[in-house]
Amino acid sequence: AVRRGTLQEHPTVWSLDLGGGLICVRQYDTILFSSKPPQQQVSYTYRLSLPDSRLELWEIGKAMTMTVLERESFALQGEDSGKMSAWFDSDELVLPLTIRSRLPGDTIRVMGLNGSKKVKDIFIDDKIPSSERSAIPLVCDGSGNIVWIPGVRRSMHAAVGRHTASVLLLTLEELEKSGET
């Protein structure tokens, strides 16, 4: 059964209980043999207000930093800082921001697309393994709109434009583990 499942083109995601506490999981191009069940999604919600500059998300081992820059500083830094950072027009962004885990039915108005798209469909289209999806936080504005999926997509809300006076930079990074040398 394992050989057949690994050689078949579809389905691209599956798991098989091998007995004795072992499982075999296929996630797109990866085959994993494990003695523990896949990690269940941890539910969390945090508020990120402007005076705060760093928020630690212990549930997923990451930290979110927030920096406000004037237009001139933003122009010097440039907008290309990778998928783990996002720039927003701070005057257009509805505060406070909320960082939370994914919920069933979540949608985002993706920059460059007309209309909205389900977060689950974006994860599937980008071939993000289901075991990694719970570690990706969603950043929502004060109206509840998802404005950024770190490492994945940014929404069209509060996009930086030529009339932007100040810019809010959000960055997601790995939490440094204490006690390691």
What are these regions (language model features)?
Residues 1-181:
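AMP-forming adenylation/ATP pyrophosphatase catalytic core
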